[in-house]
């Protein structure tokens, strides 16, 4: 997966899809009460990016529904994944609980309700911290309560706090989430990978590849903009790279030394199937 980073309005979405990205990451902001309101990041953000692009969340979902529905004039065949980077910092537990329910409601009303079996996006619901787990609890409860639990086949889950994954697994177990987990590791592109290192990323990949282990389906790295970082991630065996330069990452994947081992995922590929790195 070549995941375009910080895609918060329609112009930049078009630009990244034109570059060939098969997935995007979008930042979702919430009111103090927990209502999902906008695709928006704000300052500070990644280096060499404009931080203030924005669009209403309802409009965003309607637009990506058009882009991901076969037969729609706007359909983009290669567009198959969206990481919803949920900006939950500062919300009370009550607001987090409301937010999870309302995110489910909005996905149903503005994305799935007009063709639940026709649309193609897998949503990765990305929560910043395990202490915000009640958000996922109410998200799941609401989807099941209104009879859309079949659409959980198109949903993955992630905590992005870069914590000890053995502890993260316990949180997933407590939530009753035993599959469809996309684990991630990363930091802003303003800090070189050299300073962060790849030890945690390597640990996630090793854990993913343990036979019979089900709590990691995919591993992606963020936010990689340099060739050395992207090549290192591919060599380690990641399933996805989040980047500010999708065409650059795709170009690296298509180089002869990588194209024999990697290709961009398509809709025909299972977003929860493990592709274990061979020895």
UniProtKB/Swiss-Prot annotation:
Keyword Metal-binding attached: yes
Per UniProt, subcellular location reads as: Secreted
Question: What cofactor requirement does the entry state?
Answer: Mg(2+)
Q: Where is the active site?
A: 5, 41 (nucleophile)
* Disulfide bonds listed in the record: 45-51, 47-190
Q: In which tissues is it expressed?
A: Expressed by the venom gland.
**Annotated positions binding Mg(2+):** 25, 27, 85
Q: Where is the signal peptide?
A: none
Annotated Gene Ontology cellular component terms:
extracellular region
Q: Which keywords does this chain's UniProt record carry?
A: Cytolysis, Dermonecrotic toxin, Disulfide bond, Hemolysis, Lipid degradation, Lipid metabolism, Lyase, Magnesium, Metal-binding, Secreted, Toxin
Q: Which GO terms describe its molecular function?
A: lyase activity; metal ion binding; phosphoric diester hydrolase activity; toxin activity
Q: Which reaction does it catalyse?
A: an N-(acyl)-sphingosylphosphocholine = an N-(acyl)-sphingosyl-1,3-cyclic phosphate + choline; an N-(acyl)-sphingosylphosphoethanolamine = an N-(acyl)-sphingosyl-1,3-cyclic phosphate + ethanolamine; a 1-acyl-sn-glycero-3-phosphocholine = a 1-acyl-sn-glycero-2,3-cyclic phosphate + choline; a 1-acyl-sn-glycero-3-phosphoethanolamine = a 1-acyl-sn-glycero-2,3-cyclic phosphate + ethanolamine
Describe the task this protein carries out.
Answer: Dermonecrotic toxins cleave the phosphodiester linkage between the phosphate and headgroup of certain phospholipids (sphingolipid and lysolipid substrates), forming an alcohol (often choline) and a cyclic phosphate. This toxin acts on sphingomyelin (SM). It may also act on ceramide phosphoethanolamine (CPE), lysophosphatidylcholine (LPC) and lysophosphatidylethanolamine (LPE), but not on lysophosphatidylserine (LPS), and lysophosphatidylglycerol (LPG). It acts by transphosphatidylation, releasing exclusively cyclic phosphate products as second products.
In Swiss-Prot or TrEMBL terms, this protein is called: Dermonecrotic toxin LspiSicTox-betaIE3i
Q: Which organism is it from?
A: Loxosceles spinulosa
């Amino acid at each position: 997966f070549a995941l375009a980073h910080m895609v918060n309005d329609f112009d930049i979405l078009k630009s990244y899809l034109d570059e060939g990205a098969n997935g995007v990451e979008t930042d979702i902001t919430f009111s103090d009460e927990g209502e999902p309101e906008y695709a928006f990041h704000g300052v500070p953000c990644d280096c060499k990016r404009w931080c203030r692009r924005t669009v209403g969340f309802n409009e965003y979902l309607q637009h990506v529904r058009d882009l991901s529905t076969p037969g729609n004039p706007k359909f983009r065949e290669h567009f198959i994944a969206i990481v919803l980077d949920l900006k939950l910092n500062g919300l009370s537990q009550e607001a987090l609980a409301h937010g999870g329910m309302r995110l489910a409601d909005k996905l149903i009303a503005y994305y799935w309700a007009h063709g639940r079996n026709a649309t193609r996006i897998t949503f990765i619901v990305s929560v910043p911290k395990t202490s915000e787990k009640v958000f996922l609890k109410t998200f799941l409860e609401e989807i099941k309560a209104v009879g859309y639990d079949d659409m959980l086949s198109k949903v993955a889950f992630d905590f992005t706090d870069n914590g000890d994954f053995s502890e993260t697994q316990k949180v997933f177990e407590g939530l009753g989430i035993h599959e469809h987990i996309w684990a991630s590791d990363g930091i802003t592109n303003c800090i070189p990978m050299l300073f962060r290192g790849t030890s945690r990323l390597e640990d996630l990949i090793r854990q993913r590849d343990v036979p019979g282990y089900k709590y990691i389906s995919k591993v992606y790295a963020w936010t990689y903009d340099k060739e050395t970082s992207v090549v290192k991630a591919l060599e380690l065996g990641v399933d996805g790279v989040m980047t500010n330069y999708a065409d650059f990452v795709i170009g690296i994947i298509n180089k002869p030394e990588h194209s024999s081992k990697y290709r961009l995922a398509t809709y025909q590929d299972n977003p929860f199937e493990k592709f274990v790195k061979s020895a």
